[in-house]
């Protein structure tokens, strides 16, 4: 027995009138688990069935770490230039304009200061959506200024890395940022101000070779890709099969390059715990 009976046969709908399910309502994890997008956001963008940590950007990390999502962004309008007149498949200057329009970001890092569990904190967070989170002159300068703000105001510093490495379109200008940010972190250490480095998926290239591995405590989200050259490059170069889980956060932790792996739900509590322990403050 059917619940509904068609009164008229041969009814057709024009293609332009057909309605598809809107994009963004569902998310499918790499293991095939499907989750409602709103539920995913409530779960801090972590798939509840398989614990897969979805890549997120600075807006989401600021929401997670700052109290009531209240913060002041530093150097918000700083943008990259094209000193070399670089051209690959398109002009670098045009690429910058396009990606700024697409992502609504000014560059691949944002710096903000606000309260986390009631105490001041400076956070620099990278955005992979902006040219693969690549590190150019503006990224290095914003990180350096964020560190300066920490030193001047004696505020702990947190760096959230999510990057493919140096920005090839800026050549040596990009490579200079490795030395620049590392030197600034040395000044931060001399000032005895704590620095927590959070590696997220992916943390590779010059980012790994500089500030991402220089924290007083280096932590990572589960399953993050962490390395210098990516696994495909290593495999093609060496001609050898790679160990199981090569360059995952768990592999890197096992080999001593990380201190802890921290699930996203625990980030705010754990980061503040580490800072309290370093500063010998009462644990919040």
Curated annotation (Swiss-Prot):
Ranges where the CoA carboxyltransferase N-terminal domain occurs: 24-284
EC number of this enzyme: 2.1.3.15
Highest taxon in the source lineage: Bacteria
Listed GO biological process terms: fatty acid biosynthetic process; malonyl-CoA biosynthetic process
GO CC annotation: acetyl-CoA carboxylase complex
Catalyzed reaction equations: N(6)-carboxybiotinyl-L-lysyl-[protein] + acetyl-CoA = N(6)-biotinyl-L-lysyl-[protein] + malonyl-CoA
Pathway(s) per entry: Lipid metabolism; malonyl-CoA biosynthesis; malonyl-CoA from acetyl-CoA: step 1/1
Enzyme class: transferase
Subcellular location: Cytoplasm
GO MF entry, a single one: acetyl-CoA carboxylase activity
Annotated keywords: ATP-binding, Cytoplasm, Fatty acid biosynthesis, Fatty acid metabolism, Lipid biosynthesis, Lipid metabolism, Nucleotide-binding, Transferase
Gene3D superfamilies given in the database record: 2-enoyl-CoA Hydratase, Chain A, domain 1
Subunit structure: Acetyl-CoA carboxylase is a heterohexamer composed of biotin carboxyl carrier protein (AccB), biotin carboxylase (AccC) and two subunits each of ACCase subunit alpha (AccA) and ACCase subunit beta (AccD).
Stated family: Belongs to the AccD/PCCB family.
Main function: Component of the acetyl coenzyme A carboxylase (ACC) complex. Biotin carboxylase (BC) catalyzes the carboxylation of biotin on its carrier protein (BCCP) and then the CO(2) group is transferred by the transcarboxylase to acetyl-CoA to form malonyl-CoA.
HAMAP family (UniProt xref): AcetylCoA_CT_beta (MF_01395)
Protein name per its UniProtKB record: Acetyl-coenzyme A carboxylase carboxyl transferase subunit beta
Originating species: Flavobacterium psychrophilum (strain ATCC 49511 / DSM 21280 / CIP 103535 / JIP02/86)
Lineage: Bacteria, Pseudomonadati, Bacteroidota, Flavobacteriia, Flavobacteriales
């Amino acid at each position: 027995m059917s619940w509904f009976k068609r009164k008229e046969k041969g009814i057709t709908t024009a293609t332009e009138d057909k309605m598809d399910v809107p994009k963004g309502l569902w998310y499918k994890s790499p293991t095939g688990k499907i989750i409602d997008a709103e539920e995913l956001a409530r779960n801090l963008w972590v798939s509840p069935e398989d614990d897969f940590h979805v890549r997120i950007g600075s807006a989401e990390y600021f929401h997670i770490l700052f109290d009531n999502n209240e913060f002041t962004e530093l150097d918000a309008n700083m943008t990259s230039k094209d000193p070399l007149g670089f051209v690959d498949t398109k002009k670098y200057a045009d690429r910058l304009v396009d990606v700024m329009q697409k992502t609504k970001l000014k560059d691949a890092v944002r710096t903000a200061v606000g309260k986390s569990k009631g105490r001041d904190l400076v956070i620099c967070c990278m955005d992979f959506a902006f040219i693969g989170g690549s590190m150019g002159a503006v990224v290095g300068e914003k990180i350096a200024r964020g560190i300066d703000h920490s030193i001047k105001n004696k505020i702990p510093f947190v760096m959230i890395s999510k990057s493919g490495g140096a920005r090839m379109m800026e050549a040596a200008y990009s490579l200079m940022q490795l030395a620049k940010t590392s030197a600034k972190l040395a000044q931060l250490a001399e000032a005895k101000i704590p620095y927590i480095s959070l590696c997220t998926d992916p943390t590779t290239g010059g980012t790994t070779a500089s500030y991402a591995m220089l924290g007083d405590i280096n932590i990572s989200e589960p399953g993050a890709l962490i390395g210098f050259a990516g696994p495909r490059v290593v495999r093609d170069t060496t001609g050898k099969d790679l160990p199981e889980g090569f360059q995952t956060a768990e592999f890197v932790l096992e080999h001593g390059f990380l201190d802890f792996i921290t699930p996203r739900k625990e980030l705010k509590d754990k980061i503040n715990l580490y800072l309290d322990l370093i500063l010998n403050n009462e644990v919040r």
